[in-house]
Amino acid sequence: MAALLEAMPDLTVDAESLPTIRQLFAALAAGPEPDGLDATEHTVDEAAGIVLRVLRRSETAASPRPCVYWIHGGGYVIGDRRMDDVRLAAWVRALDCVVASVEYRLSPEHPFPTPLDDCERGLRWVHAHADELGIDIARIGIAGLSAGGGLTAALAQRTKGDTSLPVIFQLLDSPMLDDRQVTPSSRADWLAVWSRDSNRFGWASYLGEHSGAETMPEHAVPARATDLTGLPPTLVLAGGADGFCDEDVEYATRLNRSGIPTELHVYPGAPHGFTMFPGSSLAEQADRDVIDWLRRQFER
């Protein structure tokens, strides 16, 4: 665990550091294309910059493949569609699925609801173009990490009951769900990777004029939703040393109480974003759990 923490960057994100951190993440994401896979780019809205990166096996499938619609993390303020290529490519190889990773506009330049709107538009594009992508429209689920997990939860809330946009699951990896920072884990002073101050900046950037308000627009903050019925089966991953741990466990508990088939995995000692480092034993265990769960969802 100590080696993992040492390898992870200390991200103190604020208005001053944001441009530099964005450049760092862009450089890290600019790696080679995944071996043995087709990686294609599809423009949803050129003016808005909404782009989908689609990963799939090179060989033609005998039947349409299931799909994971992926929303990247970055505190609502950093990141891009390529940053999780290594991890997502492993899912494609293990499950013979298609992964579509969406590029959405970032805050603070584009506060709520723009990022969520972009994610919804990308998902609608995937549904509309499922045939040409070789996707089984009856086996599309949504997933995301950190802020992407928050957007995934919000997207599931927004689209529940929408028969034109069915999703069969939501996978929430260390999701950023609650702007209030009132849980014990969110108040810890030893948080690695994503500090309390960075979290405050991320939420303020995303919520814009609504930041700090007692009430929020619908679907802006997933943890503030009062009705969680009708959501799809859910997997929640939480790191025991993540500031989001308590809010993630609480959200999973609320889903379970609302009758949603919910699986919760808490990884002792894991900091925020640990699944972004596939060489660590914790990340490898988490992805074994994820692949097992995804396989079960696709086979239902």
Task: For the regions a language model picked out, list residue spans one by one.
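Catalytic active-site module of serine/aspartate enzymes centered on a nucleophile-bearing elbow/loop
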Residues: G279-R300
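A glycine/proline-hinged amphipathic helix-loop "lid/cap" segment
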Residues: M1-R57, F298-R300
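Gly/Ala-rich beta-loop-alpha elbow adjacent to hydrolase catalytic centers
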Residues: G144, G148, T152
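Hydrolase active-site cap/lid region
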Residues: Q157-A213
